[in-house]
Each structure stands twice: as structure tokens, then as C-alpha cells.
């Protein structure tokens, strides 16, 4: 679209100019129809495009989580993923994708760790840049996030991140710096938190770094409800407050202008940037209505992506791949029939479909007898009862139950979990409303059923008009719904199979709750989760699983975490698997260790006290729509695993360098590990990990020549050398290997990590094939942040280039030199 920005600015009213600086609703910018300025739509999330609705949304493609994407170490593949993200945005009528997330998972406990890419800033930045390039090739703008330091969820709006300038530059800002240099996305989202005493959204120092030092000029938008002031945020450089209606702009900007606390030129500058964003975004050929686009080629890409993200952690005695001639196989675990396709929070969406491991194994082994047992549940809340519920409908009112009420809206329901943060209806009071959900529930098994109701608001559950759960006055804050919900309140009732019961929930919106919380984001209308299951005997479930494993030729035990354990809004309190899972795994290994493969699904590391006893361990992350197919493709050898860990896997959470400095204490968190994040710390102090950064096995074998050959012996930042080694597939099947280039400065007088990743390449080789692999060093390979000079410094001297297949498996070495010490700023 042709938008004459100068003309608009010269003909626009002051009121409309200021209105441009905030959204009009949850997802849209302010339009000016008389000057042909359209409204621009943005949308979540990090692993799929939800569209404009958390509640009753249009289905979408669900991609593997961020750590899964990074574990491919495949920039070309992530470019394809970015294109798919862009196309999904267009189908949802969205011009701007709120992603990717490139914060640093300094601790395995971070609630959004699964959204991020890697503990290493080079890997995170490179993978994000590829994804952004793909997305923006479709015309959709990427809003990379969260700038910067939103590395925990605890009190994320209030916490003050205390971090040295060196760590800030070398670790936490570096991914954004790489993205700015290699992709230059059109938008940047600020974080909720403070950095060294100042909210980022109000920090002129931080935002000037982007525009002045880096010469990158994106639209800078706030995170949702992450604007806290009028004057400071305007003067710092925040262009767009989201969402709308505005809380800190509008008439407050007018008042500040009259008091000369904000200059008119500042308003013009912010409005110009918003109009530039509108001009760029409006060129995208978006759909007029939100639609789906579930195409075969997208399914194939998603399946390939899931399989290539899987990391083979352990394969003792080559237990994998499993033969397809198995006569009897046991499938054990909570994730076998209910795959964990994504984490929670902004990553949540309604998927087009899901493929379970049970379905995928049934397809792969059509003539094999399958023994299925849950063994132990992995859910935090009782599972939803969607498949047992019919005729469900929700009615909305402004008045509470028991009073004379006028129906304001009706919504057909297919789920017993809902979030109403962006729900709206004519004449419905969004600040305070009530709803009644009714439906027919037909249990499939007779016995005592446990019901659980979790709310952000208030709720009463009735079964055939009998009150079963009261979650109204005696509420305890839990972790659900971005950290704002209650813990689950429970009740029980004896039910008969195949008999239909009337389910009714009397719900009150968020403001009916007596709970108040500091540091969490308060989104709109609230939420609820109704779950139920037959009251179970945990010991009997384990015994049944052990019996199946003992009888089977092989056992696949698939379990782990899910969106209830890893989510935006809260952090994990420990690194353990859900209660009962370790005991289940140990019991199965007691009878079938030599024929059992453990498949773990989580977005970040979990403790594995049984790891030394397991012959096969597979890390399957949150795999998206094609989770089951991806896992089965690897387990049965249709895909040779090539994934590599983007995170170090500690034995115990206490070994993590952030263990003593995680979560907000007294309103602040100290990044005491400084630049020694992840493998940088473990290597520096000699701490053993369960699996190192970059680790991942294959069904084939490779050899790598021992000497690194350089395109030039002298390193110059303006023309970094290329490192080369020979690599050969010495096995019997085709496979891909990731060669990782680490740089070491052993003679530097400045304390530095033992080595740091500064390049990588993924090489696919046929059996017997040999090739020379070239890895171009990063411009930043030899530098560190000099806090005295306030600049990057590359010291004169001899450096080592180390190439390996993990941070601990170095196979080739070489040396190069920097001929003189240099200082610099910028990209």
C-alpha cells in the first residue's frame, strides 16, 4: 500500500497522532480511515499462530518448541519454519508475528525456557535470525522478544535484574545483536522487567543502544500490559503501547505535552515510526477473515522438523533403532496417548490435529500387538473431559447467578478449559461478568470420579445439580493461567459408566476473585479448567505397567512434563519429573532394562536418576502436531537422529550456576554467574553434567580430521577466516553431523570462559562419503566486553579453534592469531 507518511503527519489531528501510539484492542493498532491508515494485527505465538482468540480460536499449525527448533542446529530448516509461520500469519489476517523468543535460559527452571532457543547466545541468535528471515520473506513482520532479561517468570513485571555490563553484552544482548545484524526484523518487543534499576521499557540507555549504537531502527513495542509510565517510556523511545485501550498514553500524553514534559517532536518521532511499521506491514497479503491452512506439505515439514529436533541422548549396545518385526510391544506412560505438543502461556493454541505416539506406532507396526498402560499420570491438574462431554454451551451475563439476568452472549464449547482474557461481546461488562457452562458428561468407567476445578476468578461445579467443587471464597494461588490461577480444588462423586450426567459450572470473571498478586500480568476476563478422572490406585497402575513391560519384546516408556509444568507466568520449583514418574521408570527398568527405551518430553532439562540403568534415552521436547510421528520415525529408524542439545543437562539443579541466584528476592535477582552461563560454567569449574551442550548421537559413525585448516592465519573482524576439516561417514546408513566451532583464548590476561561457540555447520553424508566442511567464524569470535572502556575488545595474541560434535567431544584443533588489539562498537 502506498502510504505518504509525511502527508499523513502534516494532515493528522493531534488526537489521532497520539492515538497511533497505543493499540485499540488486544491485537490491533489504531487506524485512521480518512487518511488510508489501516489497522495492523499482531498475533502470538512462539511455536504457532493462534490468531486473535485465546477463547474459541481458529485452529493452527503447532510447531515444536523453541529448544526443539534449536536442537536441529539447521538454519536452512528454520528458514523454512519461518516461511510457514509467515503463511500461518497471513491466514489468520495478521501482519506481525510476536516472535521469536530469544531470552537466555540461564536456569532449567525458567517457565518460558522451552520458548527460547539455547543457553549459548551465538546459537540462539543464528537460529532466530534464520527463522525471522523466512517469516519476513512472506511480508509478515517479526517482533523479536523480549528485550532484554526476561529470563524468569517470578515477579517478571517487578523484578530488577542486576547484571554486569559484560554479561549483559556478551550473553543476554548478543542474540538480539546477531538478529539485528543478520535479519533486521521490523519490530522489537521490550521485556517486563527492570535492568539495573530501570524498566527496559523506560530505559533510554537500552533503547538508544538499539537505534544509535546498532543502527537498527525497528518499531519498539511494549509487551502486553508492560508499559508503566507515560513520560519516561515516551522519552526513552517506546513507540507503541500494547494492548489497547491505552492505559498510559492518550490524554496523559496530551497533558504531558502541555506541561512540556514531552516534546511535540518526540510525539512526531514515535508516530512516524508507527506509520513506517504500518506502511511495511500493510503490504502483507493477509486474509480478510481468520482461516486455517492445514496443507499436506506443511504436515510433512512439521513431521520432518519434529524428527530432526529429537536428540538421541543414550544408545547403549545399539538398542535403537528398534526392529519393525516386533511381535509384541509395550507402550507405557502418560504421554503415549496424550502427547505434550507445546508448553503453556503464549505458546498455547488450538492445533489442527495431534498425532499421538500410540497412533504413530500403530501405523508403523500394523501387525504388532500393542500393550498400553499409563503407569503414572504426569498431569498437574486433572485431565480435561472434552472427549466425554457433549452439548456443551456457555452463556454470559453481567449479573451473578441467583439474580435476574439478561443473556449477553452464547458460545458453543468443545473443551472444559478456557481462557477469556481477550473475550468480548456487545454489552458485556469486560471488567466484571458471569457465565454458566452446561453440558452432558458420560463417563466411560464406573466408580468414584475425582473432579478438579482451577480458576482465575471464581467457580462452582455441579454434577446433576449437586455441588461437587467450590472454588470461590477459600482460594489458594497456584501457577495456572500465567501464574494468576488458584490451585485445583477437588471433589468426588460415584458415577456409572454410560450414564449421562448434567455438568454445570457457575463462573465469575477475574475480578470476582479475592486473590491479589504482585508481579504478574492481569489479563481481562479470567479462566477456568475443569478436569476429571477415575480415582486410581497408583501402585496398581505401576504393577500393570511392569507386567506389560515384562511380557513385551520391547517397551517404549514415554513421559515427561507438559504445558501445566512449563508455562509462561511461573517457574518450576524443581527439576524433577512429576510425582511417581521416576518410580514408574525404575520399576519398569527392574524387569526390562535391556529392552526398554525411555522417551522424555520436556522443553528444558529434568533430573534422570535412572539414566545409568537405561539403555536408550530419547529427548523428544514438545514436538507440535506431529509429535507421535516424529518420535516413531526416529525410534524405528526411518529418520536417523541428528539433533544436538542446545542446553547443558545437569545431573542436579543444584549444580546449575544460577541455582543460588534465581527468582526475585526483595524485588531483585542477581545474575551472580556473570558470563559463565551453561557450559561456560560447567567447563570452568570442572563440574560434570549428565549430557553436555551440543551432545546428540546418531545411528551411524563419523570421523573428523584432527587439524583445523584456516582460510587465513590472521583474524580480522571485518573479514573473519573460515575453518575447515574433513568429515567422513564411516557407518552403514546416511546421517547428518553437526560440527561445532569453539574459540578459546588460553593466553588472555582477562578471565574468560574456557571456550565459546562461534560457528557451526550441519553436514549430511551418505555411507562412505567424505567431504570438507567449512565453518565461517563469527565476527565476535575473539572479543569480550571491556567494562572500563565501554567497548568490545579483541586482544592481540594466539587463539585456538576447536571443532567437535559437542562442547566436550573436541575432534580437531588449530591456532590462529589476532595481529593487534582492537576496540569497536556497533554490529
From Swiss-Prot:
Keyword hit for Glycoprotein: yes
Gene Ontology molecular function terms on file: beta-glucosidase activity
Top-level division of the source organism's lineage: Eukaryota
Active site annotation, chain numbering: 223
Enzyme class, spelled out: hydrolase
SUPFAM superfamilies: (Trans)glycosidases (SSF51445), Anthrax protective antigen (SSF56988), Beta-D-glucan exohydrolase, C-terminal domain (SSF52279)
Compartments reported by the entry: Secreted
InterPro entries attached to this UniProt entry: Cellulose_deg_GH3 (IPR050288), Fn3-like (IPR026891), Glyco_hydro_3_C (IPR002772), Glyco_hydro_3_C_sf (IPR036881), Glyco_hydro_3_N (IPR001764), Glyco_hydro_3_N_sf (IPR036962), Glycoside_hydrolase_SF (IPR017853), Ig-like_fold (IPR013783)
Keyword Secreted: yes
Main location: secreted
Gene Ontology terms describing biological process: cellulose catabolic process
Keywords: Carbohydrate metabolism, Cellulose degradation, Glycoprotein, Glycosidase, Hydrolase, Polysaccharide degradation, Secreted
One cellular-component annotation, GO: extracellular region
Pathway annotation: Glycan metabolism; cellulose degradation
The reaction(s) this protein catalyses: Hydrolysis of terminal, non-reducing beta-D-glucosyl residues with release of beta-D-glucose
Role, per record: Beta-glucosidases are one of a number of cellulolytic enzymes involved in the degradation of cellulosic biomass. Catalyzes the last step releasing glucose from the inhibitory cellobiose.
Family in the record: Belongs to the glycosyl hydrolase 3 family.
The protein's name in its UniProt record: Probable beta-glucosidase H
Gene designation: bglH
Amino acid at each position: 500500500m502506498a502510504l505518504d507518511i509525511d502527508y499523513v503527519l502534516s494532515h493528522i489531528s493531534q488526537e489521532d497522532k497520539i492515538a497511533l501510539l497505543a493499540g485499540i484492542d488486544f491485537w490491533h493498532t489504531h487506524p485512521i480511515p480518512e487518511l488510508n491508515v489501516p489497522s495492523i494485527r499482531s498475533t502470538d505465538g512462539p511455536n504457532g499462530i493462534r490468531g486473535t482468540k485465546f477463547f474459541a480460536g481458529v485452529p493452527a499449525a503447532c510447531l515444536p518448541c523453541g529448544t526443539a527448533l534449536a536442537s536441529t542446529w539447521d538454519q536452512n530448516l528454520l528458514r523454512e519454519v519461518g516461511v510457514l509461520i509467515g503463511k500461518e500469519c497471513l491466514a489468520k489476517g495478521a501482519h506481525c508475528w510476536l516472535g521469536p523468543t530469544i531470552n537466555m535460559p540461564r536456569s532449567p527452571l525458567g517457565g518460558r525456557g522451552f520458548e527460547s532457543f539455547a543457553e549459548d547466545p551465538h546459537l540462539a541468535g543464528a537460529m532466530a535470525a534464520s527463522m525471522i528471515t523466512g517469516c519476513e520473506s512472506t511480508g509478515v513482520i517479526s517482533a523479536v522478544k523480549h528485550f532484554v532479561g526476561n529470563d524468569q517468570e517470578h515477579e517478571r513485571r517487578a523484578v530488577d535484574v542486576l547484571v554486569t555490563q559484560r554479561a549483559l553484552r556478551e550473553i543476554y544482548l548478543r542474540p538480539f545483536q546477531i538478529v539485528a545484524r543478520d535479519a533486521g526484523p521490523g519490530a522489537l518487543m521490550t521485556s517486563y522487567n527492570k535492568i539495573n534499576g530501570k524498566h527496559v521499557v523506560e530505559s533510554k540507555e537500552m533503547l538508544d543502544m538499539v537505534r544509535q549504537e546498532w543502527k537498527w531502527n525497528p518499531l519498539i513495542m511494549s509487551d502486553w500490559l508492560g508499559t508503566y509510565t507515560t513520560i519516561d517510556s515516551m522519552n526513552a523511545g517506546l513507540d507503541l503501547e500494547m494492548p489497547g485501550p491505552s492505559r498510559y498514553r492518550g490524554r496523559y500524553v496530551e497533558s504531558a505535552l502541555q506541561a512540556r514534559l514531552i516534546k511535540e517532536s518526540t510525539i512526531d518521532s514515535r508516530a512516524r515510526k508507527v506509520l513506517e511499521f504500518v506502511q511495511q506491514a500493510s503490504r502483507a497479503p493477509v486474509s480478510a477473515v481468520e482461516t486455517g491452512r492445514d496443507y499436506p506439505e506443511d504436515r510433512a515439514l512439521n513431521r520432518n522438523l519434529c524428527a530432526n529436533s529429537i536428540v538421541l541422548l543414550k544408545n547403549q549396545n545399539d538398542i535403537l533403532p528398534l526392529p519393525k518385526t516386533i511381535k509384541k510391544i509395550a507402550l507405557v506412560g502418560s504421554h503415549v496417548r496424550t502427547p505434550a505438543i507445546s508448553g503453556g502461556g503464549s505458546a498455547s493454541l488450538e492445533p489442527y490435529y495431534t498425532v499421538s505416539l500410540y497412533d504413530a506406532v500403530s501405523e508403523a507396526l500394523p501387525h504388532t500387538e500393542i500393550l498400553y498402560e499409563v503407569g503414572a499420570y504426569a498431569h498437574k491438574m486433572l485431565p480435561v473431559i472434552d472427549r466425554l462431554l457433549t452439548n456443551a454451551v456457555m452463556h454470559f451475563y453481567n449479573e451473578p447467578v441467583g439474580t435476574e439476568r439478561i443473556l449477553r452472549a452464547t458460545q458453543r464449547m468443545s473443551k472444559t478449559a478456557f481462557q477469556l482474557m481477550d473475550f468480548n461481546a456487545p454489552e458485556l461488562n469486560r471488567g466484571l461478568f458471569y457465565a454458566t457452562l452446561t453440558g452432558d458428561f458420560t463417563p466411560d468407567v464406573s466408580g468414584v470420579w475425582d473432579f478438579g476445578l482451577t480458576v482465575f476468578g471464581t467457580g462452582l461445579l455441579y454434577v446433576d445439580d449437586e455441588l461437587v467443587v467450590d472454588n470461590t471464597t477459600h482460594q489458594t494461588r497456584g501457577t495456572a493461567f500465567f501464574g494468576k490461577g488458584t490451585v485445583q480444588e477437588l471433589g468426588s462423586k460415584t458415577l456409572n459408566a454410560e450414564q449421562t450426567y448434567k455438568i454445570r459450572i457457575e463462573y465469575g470473571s477475574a475480578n470476582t476473585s479475592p486473590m491479589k498478586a504482585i508481579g504478574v500480568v492481569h489479563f481481562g476476563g479470567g479462566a477456568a479448567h475443569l478436569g476429571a478422572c477415575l480415582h486410581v490406585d497408583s501402585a496398581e497402575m505401576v504393577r500393570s505397567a511392569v507386567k506389560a513391560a515384562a511380557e513385551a519384546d520391547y517397551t517404549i516408556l514415554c513421559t515427561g512434563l507438559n504445558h501445566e509444568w512449563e508455562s509462561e507466568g511461573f517457574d518450576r520449583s524443581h527439576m524433577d519429573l512429576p510425582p511417581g514418574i521416576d518410580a514408574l521408570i525404575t520399576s519398569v527398568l527392574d524387569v526390562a532394562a535391556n529392552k526398554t527405551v525411555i522417551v522424555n518430553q520436556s522443553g528444558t532439562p529434568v533430573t534422570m536418576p535412572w539414566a545409568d540403568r537405561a539403555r536408550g534415552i530419547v529427548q523428544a521436547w514438545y514436538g507440535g502436531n506431529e509429535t507421535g510421528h516424529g518420535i516413531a520415525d526416529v525410534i524405528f529408524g526411518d529418520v536417523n537422529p541428528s539433533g544436538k542439545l542446545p542446553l547443558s543437562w545437569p545431573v542436579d539443579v543444584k549444580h546449575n550456576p544460577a541455582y543460588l541466584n534465581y527468582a526475585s528476592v526483595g524485588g531483585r535477582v542477581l545474575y551472580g554467574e556473570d558470563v559463565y552461563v551453561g557450559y561456560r560454567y560447567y567447563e570452568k569449574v570442572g563440574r560434570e553434567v549428565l549430557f553436555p551442550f551440543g551432545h546428540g548421537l546418531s545411528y551411524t559413525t563419523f570421523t573428523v580430521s584432527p587439524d583445523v585448516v584456516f582460510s587465513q592465519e590472521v583474524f580480522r573482524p571485518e573479514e573473519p577466516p573460515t575453518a575447515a576439516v574433513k568429515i567422513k561417514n564411516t557407518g552403514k546408513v546416511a546421517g547428518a553431523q553437526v560440527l561445532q566451532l569453539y574459540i578459546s583464548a588460553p593466553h588472555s590476561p582477562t578471565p574468560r570462559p574456557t571456550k565459546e561457540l562461534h560457528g557451526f555447520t550441519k553436514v549430511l553424508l551418505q555411507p562412505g562419503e567424505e567431504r570438507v566442511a567449512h565453518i565461517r567464524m563469527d565476527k565476535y569470535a575473539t572479543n569480550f566486553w571491556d567494562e572500563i572502556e565501554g567497548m568490545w575488545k579483541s586482544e592481540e595474541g594466539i587463539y585456538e579453534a576447536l571443532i567437535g560434535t559437542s562442547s566436550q567431544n573436541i575432534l580437531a584443533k588449530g591456532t590462529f592469531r589476532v595481529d593487534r588489539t582492537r576496540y569497536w562498537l556497533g554490529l
